[in-house]
Amino acid sequence: MKLKVGVQLFSVMTELANDYLKTLENVAKAGYKYVEYVDVPGNSPEEIGNKVKELGLTAIASHVHFDPFTSTHEDMVKIVEDNVKMHSEAIILPMGIMTTMEEIKTVAAACNEMAALAKAHGMAFYYHNHCQEFYQVEGKTAYEWLVELTDPELVFFEVDTFWATRGGQKAVELIKKLGSRAKLIHQKDMGK
């Protein structure tokens, strides 16, 4: 399997906010072939998707604003439809705050629902961690519960090695433990 290295557009957030389409052009000029979207208001999903196609970029995924506690089914459908227009291969929930078992179950159910919608439209679904998911809740980390309570055929994990390490985890061990469910990885430097 060939490793695909791309840029998470969060790293050029200021530029995106000023001119999303021009920033995509600059990313392509820098030699990137793969991008991971981040929500920035301004351009329509069609404009972004058309620009990505024009530049020969592949949108491997999209971090979306989706609140597992308040988003409705209709909200989820719109997110999926917008990402189809953006030619995104996957949708990512970039963190859910879970401090109780009830909250974990709510996030897991929302992930399962969004993942089923994504799959029906030819996309994958991922959960992206930060450090909060590694707090203990009823004998396990919230992250372990989330892995256990989500459908292994539908919900995958994008391991952010920085945040996993900040949360007290050994990122390589976490990736190995997730196995085929860890298909995307975020890496960035961490100071001492």
What are these regions (language model features)?
Residues 1-89:
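N-terminal pre-domain/capping segments
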Residues 6, 36, 61-63, 91-92, ...:
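Conserved beta-strand positions in the central sheet of alpha/beta enzyme cores
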Residues 8-12, 38-40, 64-67, 95-98, ...:
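Active-site beta-loop-alpha junctions enriched in small/polar residues
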Residues 41-51, 99-106, 110:
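Active-site-adjacent beta->alpha loops and helix N-cap segments on the catalytic face
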Residues 53, 84, 112-115, 119:
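Anion (oxyanion) recognition and catalysis
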Residues 86-103, 121-132:
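Active-site groove signature of glycoside hydrolases
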Residues 120-192:
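Acidic/histidine-rich catalytic cores of soluble enzymes
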